[in-house]
């Protein structure tokens, strides 16, 4: 850069700092790059698919899927993992369907969980914004976007047309809270439902509720589906679940993870550790027997997983080894370089 341009830039930067304060414009090279902090989802495979070991803090995340696919279970699992790290969590229950007993079975400390059951969509989003701006809450779940009913619709007659009201509400709210979320380093997860577009002949007829704003503002979007049943004999005890990362601004997208959700217990984490351990050669499988470091740990996956539950120190060592190996291949994006990519994408 020639001297005239340097002087002009220095004058512009000086004027900006006087008007907007120090740090309004920064040179990226002046600060050390830091990896984006993440909160585990409770699923080892999904943490690895996300590329940074979990869901990114200071960002908006959308989780959507059909009914009974595991959306709320996954978010409660995120809360349980965050609380283990001492985080403060809040659940904005717009659907009025949160079951404290079920949340407790998944490992959530229900006594410390902040819960709100708002009357209108405006109230729900205002509460979310105030919690974010407090800088004291680390994780906020909004369940769900479809239940964020505008005040005008609640006060109107049944059958009245309210075209675009919810989409406008979401667009305005997200414009307002996105910057606050980044400053507070808070993870905000919106659960969303699926609807069908009428008259779509080709392509995917599925869409999510609440307009397009959330699709743009979300740094991560997860599509969760139930792919089958987990049975013990004839009894169904859980569901096979597949999660696809359909958007990811912090790591390469379109990866997917498969795991089991057991009813009343949550994500079958030890089963995932066994599967990934076999895949990486850390756990040896010979016929139906599983061995770890030369010692047999069980006949059949269920018994091997039970061994890890009974010996948590071995399970945690194995999990850490799997994380270190697979996340090193993923190559997490550094925070400041990623911000530039965001700006270019938007």
UniProtKB/Swiss-Prot annotation:
Superkingdom assignment: Bacteria
UniProt keyword terms in alphabetical order: ATP-binding, Cytoplasm, DNA damage, DNA recombination, DNA repair, DNA-binding, Nucleotide-binding, SOS response
Pfam name, any one: RecA_C
Entry-linked PROSITE patterns: RECA_1, RECA_2, RECA_3
GO annotation, cellular component aspect: cytoplasm
Family to which this protein belongs: Belongs to the RecA family.
Name of the protein described by the UniProt record: Protein RecA
Gene that encodes the chain: recA
